[in-house]
Amino acid sequence: VNAGAPPAQRNSLGRSLGLGEKLFATPTERRFVAAVDDGLELVEAGLLREIAFADDIADATTRYLLAAGGKRVRPTLTLLIAQLGDGATPGIVASAQATEITHLASLYHDDVMDEAQMRRGVPSAQTVWGNNVAILAGDLLFARASTIVSGLGQEAILLQAETFERLCLGQLHETVGPREGDDPIAHYLDVLADKTGSLISTAARAGVMFSGAPREYLAPVAEFGEKIGIAFQLIDDVIDLSDQPAETGKKAGTDLRAGVVTLPVLYLRQLARTDLEASSLLNEIDRIVDATRAAAQRSDCEPTADDAPAADLAHETSHLDADFADLVRRVREHDVTERTRVEAHRWAREALDALSPLPDGPVKKALTRFADRVVERSA
């Protein structure tokens, strides 16, 4: 590992899922937790080893979001499900690393597409280095993930290719938007399935494929992963409106202000046909999104000798910020946000229903807790 590499992140199943001694109390369950924790340490050490480039710029940019932390949701899921077989085999550890690196790569690209300013509590990569470098850093990470997967055999290569295709299609469909006659909410859920559900489903499938677990568990865990991924993203839509930036790592309403489509906004559009309050909220969202973009364009212009335009811009931005803070509060307190939370819980229940073919035991118990934590989280 390079001298400038970030320290290994300490991940714990007990900490991430709340699997304390009261919840997982039997000797078998405690051994299960310890085995997954050992696997997480191997994955983390491997991430530091794999995300390393001889080129200084490539090394700094690709390690940037790794060093910023992360929940390691996908490796945790792979390692949990691997306990249905032989546990953290070399193939399991490698696949978990590849999936997490793929996820990291997608974050670089997502932040460029969404013009996001913050990620994991730090300025986003394109804010630091610009769009071109951020995109290329993501490409390098995708390439490194593919290198790891190439050592796992033809089935793994095909799975990685299919997942990458779905990630791209999800981003494409999100960018283009629904076609005339499409249901915008159904379109949005399809986008979430491709952009988020596909990779979490891949992580779940890998837990069976590379652990020697019975192949009949592949379809149930794949469905679980896809549906819990949709639930995960819907809760992100709720978290975007949170007034606790210290927990979320970004300003309240980041997606809302950037004009990113979320389920609360889609629900507002649905209601606005007959509801004056929803229509008023939508108009205010559109006004602030347009004003924010206009202010950003003016701030990018060459400065003049006259300080008055800069002072006017700062004054306008201050007013916009105050208006927007009130708008976020109104959307957060509106029924559309609670409806989004309820929809996330529905997807989580469907995900758990898919696990019925799995045997009772610590794996199913941990996956149930995994689903609960996805919809209970605040960051």
Language-model region placement:
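All-alpha prenyltransferase/terpene-synthase fold signal
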Residues: V1-A379
